[in-house]
Amino acid sequence: MDIEKITASLKNASSKLALQTASQKNEALLSVSSSIEKNRKIILEANALDVKNARERGMSESLVERLSLDDKKIDSIIDSFKLIISQTDPVGEEIAGWKTPAGMTIRQVRVPLGVVAIIYESRPNVTADAFALAYKSGNSILLRGSSSAINSNLALEKAIKQGLKNAKNGIDEAISLAPCKNHEEVEQILTAVGKVDVALPRGGAKLINMVVQTAKIPVIQTGAGICHLYVDESADLEMALNIAWNAKTQRPGACNAIETIVVNEKILNQFIPRLVEKFAGKVELRLDEK
């Protein structure tokens, strides 16, 4: 991987993107979402190949679920673009301001970071979501996904670039997908001081720890999951049951799916039987002695 060439192109793109108006960026994102829709069949075919290869290599079904795309997930990607387009442009927003005793006015203003690297695992939807968030906030993005999702990610990158080229002011150099041949590429990204401005790991604890320990560039560390739901004695129990069900079953393989439910002991006898009944045959419950 020619990290010098890739990052130079991304740096140039980020300089242009930082100067774009909200309407220019939104127009480009709308064009990209249309391109993903037009390329839906190609993206799903590429993903089917990744899933086939993963199963042949013996990947567990829980990991295959994370890797898989379907029409519903493509719809979700397109919906996320619409949501991001509808949001206020963060660039130039004044967060705080004050005047010093000496009469100097100081303002705290949001500005783009520059080149953002995302190191992530086998979820191809991250390719599209991360790009959209980066582009809206005026940043170019260097993506390094899992080798298991390479065909899906390449198809998504191609659709994104097509959408940017079709937009009047789109900057198609604002996205680059790093190859997935070996782990040396990840190290090249994480040690590209002055070329990559920040890295974000998106995955499990092992990946996050590797990024934090290897990086010589700034890292925004994310959570690794192990999500808890607490049900207090004052809770609406029907609402709590529905929240628990949704948080566990909507996407069980997602890192924000709950693993643990903590219940106030004063409502154990009221809540736990209803929880067992709702989850029966669908979710395995492992309860403590209480």
Language-model-detected regions and their locations in the chain:
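ALDH superfamily catalytic-core signature
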Residues: 2, 122-140, 159, 166, ...
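N-terminal Rossmann-like NAD(P)+-binding subdomain of aldehyde/semialdehyde dehydrogenases
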Residues: 1-105
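Short gly/ser/thr-rich secondary-structure transition/capping motifs
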Residues: 95-102, 180-182, 242-244
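Phosphate/pyrophosphate-binding betaalpha-module
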Residues: 147-222, 227-241
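Conserved acidic residues
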Residues: 114, 197, 259
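Conserved small-residue-rich beta-alpha loop and adjacent elements
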Residues: 86, 90-163, 215-219, 226
